[in-house]
């Protein structure tokens, strides 16, 4: 097994631009996030993400919520796919340049 493979398993991927699929996942958990933060976001645009392979997949998504404000959220996607999504955490008061990290 190469060092490259050892480094990737369980670790976070490099940051990648958000895709339509990542936006769809963010939109699906948005109501839970808004309930937990007691906020209604007019803008909710996924801009980048990192992934982590576990027994499923953790997605760390940076969201532009407008006015120069960003938030980071952690979404678990189970092995059964798009219908098995769980909001596992979030961080508010982030900036565009804040790096996505494990939470």
Swiss-Prot record:
The keyword Transmembrane helix does not apply. Coiled coil: none annotated. Gene3D superfamilies: 3.10.450.10. The keyword Cytoplasm applies. Keywords: Cytoplasm, Protease inhibitor, Thiol protease inhibitor. SUPFAM superfamilies: Cystatin/monellin. It is found in: Cytoplasm. GO terms for molecular function: cysteine-type endopeptidase inhibitor activity. Transmembrane segments: none annotated. Its main location: cytoplasm. This is Stefin-3. It comes from Mus musculus.
